[in-house]
Amino acid sequence: VTITFADLTTMRVGGPVGRLLVPESMSQLVDALHESAGSDDPLLVMGGGSNLVVGDIGWHGTVIKVGSSELDVDGERVTAAAGVDWDHVVRVSLDQGLAGLEALSGIPGAAGGTPVQNVGAFGTVTSDVLESLLVFDRTTGDLERWPADRCGFGSHRQSVFKRSDRWVVVEVTFRLRRSEQSRAIEYADLANRLGIEVGGTAAPADVRQAVLELRRSRGMVLDPRDHDTWSVGSFFVNPVLADVPERAAECPRYFDVKGTKLPAAWLIERSGFPRGYGREWGNGTVSLSTRHALSVTNRGGATASDVMKFAAHIRDGVEARFGIRLGPECDLVNCSF
């Protein structure tokens, strides 16, 4: 039976996998990485497949799908193997009375992917709470313990792991706090859902519940029966600009260390692409989510090529309207737009 990336990713597109390895422990993962380091076979390492689109030609080398499951709580530190389901990490930390991850509830994927993307939601980003990580260096074959500040977290969704495939995350350690209150809630949608003022706090478990409700309402919690969740979540990155074009003067804006961050969903909808757009475009297999304009979705039967053509169509429309070029937030392998 040929395994394809349509079987392994939440977008459910992509061609065949050459050779698939699924290590179920950290030691098996390190062994598999050592083996691949001595081979000329191209290597692709993936976690939950929730932020990955692979082209229709697939990947003809080796794919390591990380399945390691070790999880340890020691005081205010939570250490997770790269393959642990991310939402399980959030749940366990809250069950242990630890606050800090609640705003990241419901995000699909594995723990090892969080520093790669510097995953964030509702005002919390991985780099806020990550203390250290165990990394495999594919060049030297060494395991290295890194402090979080070595990850090269810069602007939105960036890290050294996005810029090079030399290092593979094997384990992550978060420093949380024992608290009955969340950090200040700065997002109006979340504050409204919690019934508090912006800038107020709430019980971490209540924040988790509110975040899950908001994510479900936007089609951002995986459900195989719901085509709005056949996606990578946010497909486009929110652009960060030194200067906002006059045409985008009315766009909401947020502070970022590198400039002004604009919500890509606002730009997309104001460029003539409402939620659900695309069912009448092309062959109808790809559309924006009916609940969130930032999410490109597979309506059933789409190919990676269909997804790329549709993404280019949205990107070009936004650029024509506002002079701002959107790029992908997800990882694209053997495909582009």
Regions found by a protein language model. Name each.
Residues 95, 304-310:
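Beta-rich strand-turn-strand
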Residues 29-34, 90, 191, 208-211, ...:
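A generic alpha-helix structural signal
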Residues 3-10, 143-306, 321-337:
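Phosphate/pyrophosphate- and phosphate-bearing ligand-binding catalytic cores of soluble enzymes
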Residues 1-144:
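Anion-binding (especially nucleotide phosphate/pyrophosphate-binding) glycine-rich loop
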